């Protein structure tokens, strides 16, 4: 029987790089991991709280964290010019202060930088967020999946697979539905495949969205 493996972990060191880059003693490792989680949660909560009500869209592709003894460097990769890009200096300063408060580290400076992603809809996190927004607005899940695939094709993705699991359209029995377009060669290590899992809370309960995107071949 085939065993499922996370496509990002499977390709680390070849086509994927680490989202967190730091070294720690084994006894301090769990503490560093919790710190990373806290930083990411704090940034996402801040963006959710301060983004415009009309869009309701975060557009964060990923958050990279690099740590040194005296510095924590956080790079936020965003797809769209949201509030972090527009009121750049003020927004980032406020965000830095918020994150610094969440973990009490006196000896280390925190530096937050913003990087813009070239093709936002080629990023699985942004596509999953788009689908989640559609599902919250009670759009049919099939329609939302097809629209997400169209957007990925416009971003020059070579293949995409979208899967949604849970009580779809409010049905009593939970099920899994998926659509694939193009090639998604999960077993080939040299191909660049991006993946994300995204839970979304709807009026019928929690649904799980998974997206695999085949971007490029090395």
Curated annotation (Swiss-Prot):
Keywords: Chloroplast, Plastid, Ribonucleoprotein, Ribosomal protein, RNA-binding, rRNA-binding. PANTHER family: 30S/40S RIBOSOMAL PROTEIN S3, SMALL RIBOSOMAL SUBUNIT PROTEIN US3C. One of its GO terms (molecular function) is rRNA binding. The keyword rRNA-binding applies. Its main location: plastid. It is found in: Plastid, Chloroplast. Residues 47-118 form the KH type-2 domain. Part of the 30S ribosomal subunit. Belongs to the universal ribosomal protein uS3 family. GO terms for cellular component: chloroplast; cytosolic small ribosomal subunit. This is Small ribosomal subunit protein uS3c. The keyword Acetylation does not apply. GO terms for biological process: translation. It comes from Nymphaea alba (White water-lily).
